[in-house]
């Protein structure tokens, strides 16, 4: 069985003036469908570059990237836009919620652009916010706002959930609860979840750990 996510000899070089910065050097890894994968490494090691390439937000210099048998790295701009919209859900360290929309409206907004969205209210209930749907972001704690952001990503019903330091702005216990939520999502919904972090302690929760040096 071929891997669900595959990086083959991926290189990324950023050109800044006369200086070339090698962000990724011959990166190879596989992630199977339904795995909870944690990518760890020091700041500047290239973790976010990997996530941006996998999420279709950045291009590689050479190599190949596959998702579900499709060579994402060969997509043109139009196909990449569709890929980001339909196939990938994103969760970032900062929640990026629309402040004048309720929790429910924030999730519904994301669901509107998708082919096969999940019910926004049901997803919010699943992440523990059944009683907070009518609240605005300013009325929610950091952990609750991150749960709205996770619900927003899940409501798209993506093939892949990408999380960049999702607990970075949260205290330890809140962060742990958010990670447990991501892990449960992976288990219960069969989603493939990739979490980028510098926190080695999170590796204990993972099905697969990828260390970037």
Please give the residue ranges for each predicted region:
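ABC family nucleotide-binding domain
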Residues: 4-7, 11-212
């Amino acid at each position: 069985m071929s891997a669900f996510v595959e990086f083959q000899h991926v290189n990324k070089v950023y050109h800044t003036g006369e200086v070339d910065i090698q962000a990724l050097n011959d990166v190879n890894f596989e992630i199977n469908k339904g795995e909870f994968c944690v990518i760890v490494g020091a700041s500047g090691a290239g973790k976010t570059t990997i996530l941006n390439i996998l999420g279709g937000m950045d291009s590689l210099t050479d190599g190949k990237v596959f998702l579900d048998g499709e060579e994402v790295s060969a997509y043109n701009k139009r196909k990449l836009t569709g890929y980001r919209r339909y196939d990938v859900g994103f969760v970032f360290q900062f929640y990026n919620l629309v402040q004048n929309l309720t929790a429910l409206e924030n999730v519904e907004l994301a669901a509107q652009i998708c082919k096969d969205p999940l019910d926004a209210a049901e997803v919010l209930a699943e992440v523990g916010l059944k009683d907070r749907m009518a609240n605005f972001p300013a009325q929610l704690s950091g952990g609750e706002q991150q749960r709205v952001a996770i619900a927003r990503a899940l409501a798209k019903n993506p093939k892949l959930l990408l999380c960049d330091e999702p607990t970075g702005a949260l205290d330890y216990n809140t962060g742990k609860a958010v990670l447990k939520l991501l892990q449960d999502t992976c288990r219960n919904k069969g989603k493939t979840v990739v979490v980028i972090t510098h926190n080695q302690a999170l590796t204990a929760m993972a099905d697969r750990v990828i260390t970037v040096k």
